[in-house]
Curated annotation (Swiss-Prot):
Motif ('KMSKS' region): 629-633
Keywords: Aminoacyl-tRNA synthetase, ATP-binding, Cytoplasm, Ligase, Metal-binding, Nucleotide-binding, Protein biosynthesis, Zinc
Source species of the chain: Anaplasma marginale (strain St. Maries)
Summary of the function given for this chain in its UniProt record: Catalyzes the attachment of isoleucine to tRNA(Ile). As IleRS can inadvertently accommodate and process structurally similar amino acids such as valine, to avoid such errors it has two additional distinct tRNA(Ile)-dependent editing activities. One activity is designated as 'pretransfer' editing and involves the hydrolysis of activated Val-AMP. The other activity is designated 'posttransfer' editing and involves deacylation of mischarged Val-tRNA(Ile).
Reactions the enzyme catalyzes: tRNA(Ile) + L-isoleucine + ATP = L-isoleucyl-tRNA(Ile) + AMP + diphosphate
Protein name: Isoleucine--tRNA ligase
Record EC number: 6.1.1.5
Group of enzyme by EC: ligase
Motif, 'HIGH' region: chain positions: 50-60
Binding, ATP: 632
Subunit structure: Monomer.
Domain notes: IleRS has two distinct active sites: one for aminoacylation and one for editing. The misactivated valine is translocated from the active site to the editing site, which sterically excludes the correctly activated isoleucine. The single editing site contains two valyl binding pockets, one specific for each substrate (Val-AMP or Val-tRNA(Ile)).
Compartment list: Cytoplasm
Amino acid sequence: MNYYPEVKGNPEFSAIEKEILQYWNSEKIFEESVNTRSRDRSFVFYDGPPFANGLPHYGHLLTGFIKDAVARYKTMRGFRVERKFGWDCHGLPAEMLAEKELGVSGKVSIESFGIDKFNDYCRSSIMRFTQQWREYVERQGRWVDFENGYRTMDKSFMESVMWAFHELWHKGLVYESVKVVPYSWACQTPLSNFETKMDNAYREKVSKSVTVRFKLSEQVGFVPQGVESCSILAWTTTPWTLVSNFALAINTNMDYVGAVVGAEMLIFSAGYLDHFMRYCERHSLECAKVVQIPAKELLAVKYMPPFPYFADSKNAFMVLDAEFVAEGAGTGIVHLAPGFGEDDFLLCKQHGIPNLGEESRGMLSVICPIDDAGRFTAAVGDFAGQHVFDVVDAVIRQLKEKGLWFATEQCTHSYPHCWRTDTPLIYRATSSWYVEVTKLKARMVELNKEVNWVPEHVQSGQFGKWLDGAKDWSVSRHRFWGAPVPVWRSDDPKYPRTDVYGSIKKVLPDVKALEEDFGPVEDLHRPYIDNLVRPNPDDPTGKSMMRRVPDVLDCWFESGSMPYAQMHYPFENKEFFDSHFPADFITEYIAQTRGWFYTLFVLSTGLFDRHPFKNCICHGVVLDIKGQKLSKRLNNYPDPMEMFEKYGADSVRFTMLSHAVSIGGDLLLDQDGDVVRDTLKSVVKPIWNSYSFFTVYANSDQMQGRILESLEGITNIMDQYILYECACMVVKVLEAMESSSAGVRDPYNIRLACAAIVQFSDKLNNWYIRGCRGRFWMRDKTADKSDAYNTLYTVLYHLARTIAPFLPFIAESIWLGLSFQREKSVHLADFPDASSFSAVHQYKKNAEYMQLAMDVCSHVLSLRNAHNIRVRQPLRRMVVYPYNCESLLDMPQQYRDIILNEVNVKSLQIASTIGDMASFELKLNFALLGQRVPEKVKQIITLARAGVWEVQSDGSLLLGAPGCEQCVIQKDEFSLNLKVHSEYACQIISGGVPVGVLHIDHELTRELLLEGIARDVMRLIQQARKDCGLEMLDHAEVIINTDAAEIIEAISIWYDFIKQQTFSHTLEHRPAQAVVEDCSKYTKISGKDFDIFLCKSALCS
């Protein structure tokens, strides 16, 4: 009878994972993991909503793995972790897809097509990939609640968003204004400032820059006699904006000059003079004179506009003072187009430029002669209907015709692009609704100090600095598919009125409700919400109507509202939300410090005066092997589903969680997924093999493992050691994932947790199991053998629970296979508790001896490798010379035996002193000695050369022999370097410090040579077993063909040992040329001077 399943050592992990997925689904393990935990002990994390109009990529998978690992961990720590999945439905991604598929482009086309039909298409297409998303999420082993998830386009969600806007308005944090903002002419909408900072939105752009003459229109005193015309030189990288130039700016803290060339004076900054002189030299121009011009004399100087379109504007076309003008930027004089530059707009507004005598609801009218698609309007006759980027050459041509052109150069500069269409943005004056973030900034900075960021530097670095420079947030978009800006205003400015609504039905006393004024509301989307109109109550004529402003809200406003909108707060779940906010945990990639994390922070501060989350992991980015962004166009990454099939989802998960990408670094992923393959080989398979090893031998011996509840009677030092190391692993994972100290925030260092698991797996497989194989192989069922089984079974019990959040599939398979039936799933079990391991601390000294033994072995193996002495070749002796290490001197014989067995050496001697095997070289720190005792440096050098010194207990060094001249130097004023005197010796480093020297005897006797040959034969038999596909306990029939006398003798001497170690039922020697009958049934492998033929024994059939 087998107590455990037959576990193969090299399984198809994807098949195992699919079986586990079926088990989870059929047994509803996820649902049970939530429902069995008390609501009184909830752990809240926010699942940021992805757009569902495309398939998941590795960035989504990485985020999902981190979320799932933390959620599983916290569940096993006793918390109730609800995991609602959300969908981001509104905004440009959906609209751009609809435009492409419907063949419409731009607002005019959409309005002609029909807003209702356009939005209906967006509604249906946005959820197109939800099934594929679900398949990806489930296949990666992530548990989420799809059935009770939220969608930002749902009426309940949108009502909460409407309430949030109303609350901010009510608190005086929302206003409407005209500002110059980043504008996507491809999407025909303004963008927020943080959208230009995300996803590497800046690209290198080659533009034509132009230097232009602005001719003065009045006489000025600083112009010398004989000069017929005077012009100011200004430089710009956007020549198309010159058609709406309204002013020039200088910096009065800079120096300016006038250069006379012929009958013309050209004015520019002193810093531009060298560039100007080189220009004159290239063009054979003679600069006759350069005069200094006080900057203040340039202020208010009038000039003639380069283009006539707005020449009648009042207060315009003069020189202004501006601090933003910088030395080294062009000519030191900036042309101002207030419709296309933020600084230009603010400076011109300050000076009343242009003053058209028109004010509308407190907003300054600005000449901005382009339409929504970035084309010039009829106000600019020569360029009407042309796109701003298409008129550059024509503008330069006209400047030349007017005699205003001075120079054209190619300019490569970093330029913002639309995050959705990858087209270059423009800056455009436009009307928008703003959240007044500047009012909240100081409070946000304070609240940020209460958040635990991973990595820690984000708090004061990327996020902290972003908060320091926070600007008011443009939250309205001139688009169609989104939550409406809930503002209605009078259509007649003679009877102004503005209403802001915060609910559909009248539920909250201080919140204006739509149905109070408009009747039943079925849909909050356009065009239905636009059709809600009513007479203006403040118009006694009854003619004006209250109409909604046509904008929709930025989709970032919606995702930033998800903590409460997913619950339909405050209309439902108010008590629950109030008691479970802020979230305990959140994670996304690091650029969300300027995106989702930021909008969550703004809205949470504005609405609740609280930070929105307590702990935040900012993970890095997955790139291709060249460091490029993963791209369908470049085809530079492997399909995630193929990686799951090839290596298993656990391997992909652990690759990401254990890498620096989980704490903000970047992961380079090659086309074949080699980094994932390496994880499978170095982490997943070793853990699996420890499980496989147990089941194979336990079934063979008919042994049933028992969890050790008590450590009484555990006498084997290997058992003591691995139990202690298991406890250390659990403690390290707990410390990495959370602090046990009251009031200390959770660090959530998943990478450290994974490192602890990897380190323990290495010790379990490469030290404990390998070192204890003989205990499992012995025929008799001794107490020691039973102890080995119970110890390994206990370790696997704790290991399965510890790795469950990080390797959920194989953890579950191990749990079910070893019949740990305390819970029907490892994910329903409790995470190991450090307190339950308190008894193993009695084995700490044991572990120190064992680590020292491992370090000694490592150095012996390094020496062997350096001298090409294979490990299978036994050596006669090794000698250890301790240095300041009592543990080496008094190491018990059991540990010495382990060393000998591990490194294949017959005897180990431990000397009492280093003797002649090595010596110390004294190196003095003359810089420190010269500062402290300059008068004694010569004496110290003399004493040091004598070579008599002694290290004192406090670490200082006593120079000189007793009874003679002596001197003490401090421990930081010298160092002792150990120098070995034999090429077959080396230092022993343990715990990072030298603890002695070891020497190996490399002389080989005939007996040693023959044993080495026998071990070489054994290795090739083991390789033949593997090639033949034999399982661990399968017996083999072996034939060795050779005429080599030494090989024959070695086989004869070590015959029984070879059979036992290789599980060979028969072992037969034949001459080299002997014919092997029925050769096809054998696997053949050749060594030097011999061939091995191996097949599975008939005993195994």
